[in-house]
């Protein structure tokens, strides 16, 4: 996790059993209420979408740019309504979306940004790694991806320090550490989605970041 943070240039990263778990956690932390909408590219993998649907959000599908196969600030803006809460940006095939423009739009509208960078680890936009612009970044170490473990693995990056403080327990059965300021010993969690230690040991010696 520390090496990953150093590589992509962010303060908080959490190793998971796969990237879908990262999207599930991000969707959980967005805290959707009835009627909330999430904007998702019309061209993506199912894991980019169904975690948000499971949490009760209504999906608005954004068009992609025909040349880069990723969304743009313009295609996203067409989908924004007074119910929009989250934008999911998917960086595909090594193409990074124009994140400075998308982040400017998100900040103007007060929207959460989740970056699905499962197919774009190491891609830079204006000198900054994708997955580090938004509130959440999700990466995959599946055997078909840029960096691999022994079959599956993922990483979730977060900007918010408070969220970073609770993520270790959210990914591990809601189990609070003994030094955690808590009202109860257990918190609502996804289950156990930690990256297996064996995968972590395999990841770094066999990849070159």
What are these model-derived regions, one by one?
Residues 2, 100, 152:
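Active-site phosphate/pyrophosphate- and oxyanion-stabilizing loops and adjacent acidic/basic residues
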Residues 2-26, 37-44, 62:
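Short loop-beta-helix segment that forms the pyridoxal 5′-phosphate
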Residues 16, 41, 90, 140, ...:
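Conserved residues at the C-terminal ends of beta-strands
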Residues 28-117, 124:
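PLP-dependent aminotransferase-like
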Residues 79-81, 129-134:
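Active-site nucleotide-sugar/metal-binding loop of Leloir-type enzymes
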Residues 120-126, 133-209:
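Active-site region of PLP-dependent enzymes
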